[in-house]
Each structure stands twice: as structure tokens, then as C-alpha cells.
């Protein structure tokens, strides 16, 4: 285990000695002057949005707060099952009516 650590340390030392960190000879390009965001220190914050009359003082940032529903109670489950059964019955009656109309012609 110590041998592997020694080999890794030697490799790191050799790599550090063979790769000197010197600045390159390429200069940075000049700062652009006609862009919205540049490297010049004269940026100013954007102005605040005007108050919208229909939203009141909240402006356009008003949004509904989501809430999480819990488990449905027994009555809600029964109402849901009744609606599903009624929808299936209506769908079946539509199919039956369509079949009768197709047979008449």
C-alpha cells in the first residue's frame, strides 16, 4: 500500500516539475463597448416594474399557493365511483345507439 502511494507521489512530483505554469503569450481581447453586459464597471440595476392596476400592489408576482390534498374520505370515494359508473353507462348506451342506427341503414 505504501509502495502505491510512493509511486503516485513520484508521478505527481514529476508532472508538476515538467509542466511549468507560466502565463501564455496571448493577450485578452479588449472589452466590448456596445453590449448590454460588458466587463466595464458601469452596469446599473434594471428599474422595477410598474404596478399593474388589476393586480394591486402585488404586481405580476401574485400566484396561487399550491396545497396538497390528503386522502379522500369515504363519501368522496363513493361519488367518484358513481361518476365513473355513470360515464361507463353513457358510453355503453352511445355504442348501443350507434349500433342500432347502423342497422337501420
Curated annotation (Swiss-Prot):
Give the signal sequence positions: 1-17
> Per the UniProt entry, what is one GO biological process?
vitelline membrane formation involved in chorion-containing eggshell formation
Q: Which InterPro entries match?
A: Vitelline_membr_Cys-rich-dom
MF-aspect GO terms: structural constituent of vitelline membrane
Assigned keywords, A-Z: Secreted, Signal
Q: Quote the cellular component terms of the Gene Ontology held in the record.
A: egg chorion; extracellular space; vitelline envelope
Q: Can you tell which superkingdom this protein's organism belongs to?
A: Eukaryota
Disulfide-linked positions: none
Any idea where this protein resides?
Secreted
Check the record and name the Pfam families matching this protein. Vitelline_membr
Ranges for domain VM come to 25-62
* Family, as annotated: Belongs to the vitelline membrane family.
What this chain does, per the entry, is described as: Major early eggshell protein.
Q: What is this protein called?
A: Vitelline membrane protein Vm32E
Q: What organism is listed for this UniProt entry?
A: Drosophila ananassae (Fruit fly)
Amino acid at each position: 500500500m505504501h509502495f502505491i502511494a510512493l509511486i503516485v507521489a513520484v508521478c505527481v512530483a514529476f508532472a508538476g516539475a515538467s509542466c511549468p505554469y507560466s502565463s501564455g503569450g496571448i493577450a485578452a481581447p479588449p472589452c466590448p463597448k456596445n453590449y448590454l453586459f460588458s466587463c466595464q464597471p458601469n452596469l446599473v440595476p434594471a428599474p422595477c416594474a410598474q404596478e399593474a392596476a388589476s393586480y394591486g400592489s402585488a404586481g405580476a408576482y401574485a400566484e396561487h399557493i399550491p396545497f396538497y390534498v390528503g386522502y379522500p374520505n369515504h363519501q368522496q370515494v363513493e361519488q367518484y365511483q358513481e361518476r365513473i359508473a355513470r360515464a361507463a353507462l353513457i358510453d355503453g348506451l352511445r355504442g348501443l345507439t350507434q349500433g342500432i342506427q347502423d342497422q337501420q341503414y
